[in-house]
Structures are given as C-alpha cells and as structure tokens.
C-alpha cells in the first residue's frame, strides 16, 4: 500500500501542460459550478455527459438534436436552455438523456486531461465519495 500519494494542484486549465508528468489520476474540480452541475445531473438521472471546450462544438451537438448546456462568465449562453447551475438539473427532465456541456473553465479542465486513465470529477458535493474512490485506487501521483 502506498502510504503517501504525491498530490499536485493546477489552478487553471491553461497551466495543465506545465504540470504534466506521469500522473495516474487527474481530478477535475471547478470550484464554482461546473463539476457540481455534473454531479447533480448524474444524481438526477442524466445518463451521459459530453464535456466540450468551445461554443462551436456545443452548437454542432445542438444541431444534431442533443440537449446542450452552455455557460460563459456565469451566464447561460443565448440560444441554450441550460447553463452550469446545479439547480437546472434538480429534476427528472433529462433522466436517461445525454447532455453536452460547455463552461468557461470546468469543461476545458476536463478536456485537457482526457488522455489520463483515471479522470474523475470532483466537487464539494461528492467529496466523500471522491476521497474514498481515490483511496481505493491506491495510486502514488494525483493531479488536481
């Protein structure tokens, strides 16, 4: 058992390339809202979430008929019915559906780490489950 994992913290998606090493786990946390919205959406039955970095990608999915949530600078982007507020997902409207999500920072943080074997979503609302999961993985290098 590894006694003390090394934990590195990266504060913005733009800094991620400067921190890249042989990390075994990346935990994507958007302290303000994105990861809380993702956790809430799953809690209320969303089947799958596709995080995209740009509005252009989000528009492409919307044109294909997907439910799409888009936020920039804390506001729902015009033309989209959902944003990054967890309250938007506290119902069964999207139960068993796929949701495409783009946010100012959160989805960018997720996408820069896509190649990592263990990419997990962290939020204050899933902190207990996240901590237990990371301990079960028993890995030595964790990047947050």
Annotate each PLM feature.
Residues 1-58:
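N-terminal glycine-/serine-/threonine-rich phosphate-binding loop
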Residues 2-6, 134-139:
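Acidic-glycine-rich active-site phosphate/pyrophosphate-binding loop
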Residues 50-138:
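Acidic/Gly/His-enriched mid-domain segments of enzyme catalytic cores or analogous surface patches
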Residues 142-144:
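Conserved small/polar residues in nucleotide/adenosyl-binding loops
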């Amino acid at each position: 058992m590894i006694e003390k994992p090394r934990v590195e913290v990266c504060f913005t998606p733009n800094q991620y390339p400067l921190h890249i090493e042989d990390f075994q786990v990346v935990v994507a946390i958007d302290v303000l809202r994105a990861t809380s919205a993702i956790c809430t959406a799953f809690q209320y039955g969303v089947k799958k979430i596709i995080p995209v970095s740009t509005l252009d990608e989000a528009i492409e999915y919307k044109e294909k008929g997907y439910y799409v949530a888009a936020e920039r600078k804390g506001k729902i982007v015009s033309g989209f019915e959902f944003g990054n507020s967890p309250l938007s997902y506290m119902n069964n409207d999207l139960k068993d559906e796929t949701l495409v999500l783009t946010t100012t920072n959160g989805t960018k943080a997720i996408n820069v780490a896509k190649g990592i074997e263990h990419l997990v979503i962290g939020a204050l609302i899933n902190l207990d489950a996240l901590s237990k999961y990371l301990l079960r993985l028993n890995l030595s290098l964790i990047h947050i």
